[in-house]
């Protein structure tokens, strides 16, 4: 997907070919630079040596729904299974090993970053991933998830995180409550279950802001900028 902390490392590999889903490429066009700028402001330590990055990562090839490539005799299937962490997430399935790389669609004991997400679609995308019954998943963060029991646990853990966040914010939005009230409601619902998860505190304000927007009918996530970050923090402190 298009997030700067995920795609900007591509230049280090010196790859002659870069493949993206067409939705992800469209998001680089629309908001790639803004994401780079806002992430740099939030996490400067992640951008050490940024001077060596030649610029935004652009694909040489794109596809709409699915694409197959071969690494020697090994088949690798690239698929857009639905909106979740972003509108343009793809997953990679390696059939001969029954392994899937899900990126940030699936996490295990790590918070999901939902600031550019689609809460209402995320569960269906998780169902699509589950239907492959893979033996291992490489998630967005942390160790590989080995065995179908752990894969299932991670998918359901992700579903609980996403649903708990959205349900609490949506109840506040439905009665015309404020972003600060949504923040309080999500904390009450999620802190007892998820407060010890990696990057939970970092993700929470962005997750609440996006859940609150989606619940009020904003389908396309608003672009994050330095100014929007400031406005969000001011609203949450109110």
Segment roles from a protein language model:
Residues 2-7, 24-27, 69, 86, ...:
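Solvent-exposed loop/turn segments at secondary-structure junctions
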Residues 75-132:
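Active-site-proximal loop/helix segments of hydrolase catalytic cores
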Residues 121-181, 185:
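Divalent-metal (often Zn2+) His-rich catalytic cores of metallo-beta-lactamase-fold enzymes
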Residues 174-238:
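C-terminal regulatory/interaction regions
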Residues 1-3, 19-23, 81, 100-103, ...:
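Active-site neighborhood of phospho(di)ester-bond hydrolases with catalytic His/Asp-centered motifs
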Residues 68-70, 74-88, 222-238:
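Charge-patterned, long linear interaction tracts outside catalytic cores
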Residues 25-81, 96, 126, 130-133:
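Metallo-beta-lactamase
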Residues 1-15, 88-91:
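Di-metal (Zn2+ and/or Mg2+/Mn2+) metal-binding site signature of metallo-dependent hydrolases
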């Amino acid at each position: 997907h298009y997030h700067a902390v995920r795609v900007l490392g591509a230049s280090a590999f010196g790859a002659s070919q870069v493949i993206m889903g067409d939705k992800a490429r469209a998001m680089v066009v629309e908001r790639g630079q803004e994401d780079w700028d806002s992430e740099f402001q939030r996490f400067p330590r992640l951008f050490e040596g940024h001077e060596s990055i030649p610029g935004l990562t652009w694909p040489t090839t794109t596809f709409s729904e699915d694409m197959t490539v071969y690494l020697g005799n090994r088949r690798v299937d690239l698929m857009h299974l639905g909106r979740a962490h972003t509108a343009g997430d793809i997953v990679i399935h390696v059939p001969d090993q029954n392994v899937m790389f899900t990126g940030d669609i699936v996490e295990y004991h790590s918070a999901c970053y939902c600031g550019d997400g689609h809460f209402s679609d995320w569960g269906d995308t998780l169902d699509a991933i589950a239907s492959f019954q893979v033996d291992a998943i490489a998630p967005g963060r942390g160790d590989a998830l080995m065995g179908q029991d752990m894969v299932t646990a991670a998918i359901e853990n992700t579903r609980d995180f996403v649903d708990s966040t959205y349900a609490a914010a949506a109840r506040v939005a439905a009665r015309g409550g404020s972003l600060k009230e949504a923040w309080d409601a999500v904390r009450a619902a999620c802190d007892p279950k998820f407060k010890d998860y990696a990057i939970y505190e970092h993700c929470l304000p962005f997750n609440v802001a996006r859940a609150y927007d989606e619940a009020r009918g904003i389908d396309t996530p608003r672009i994050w900028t330095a100014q929007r970050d400031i406005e969000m923090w001011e609203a949450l402190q109110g």
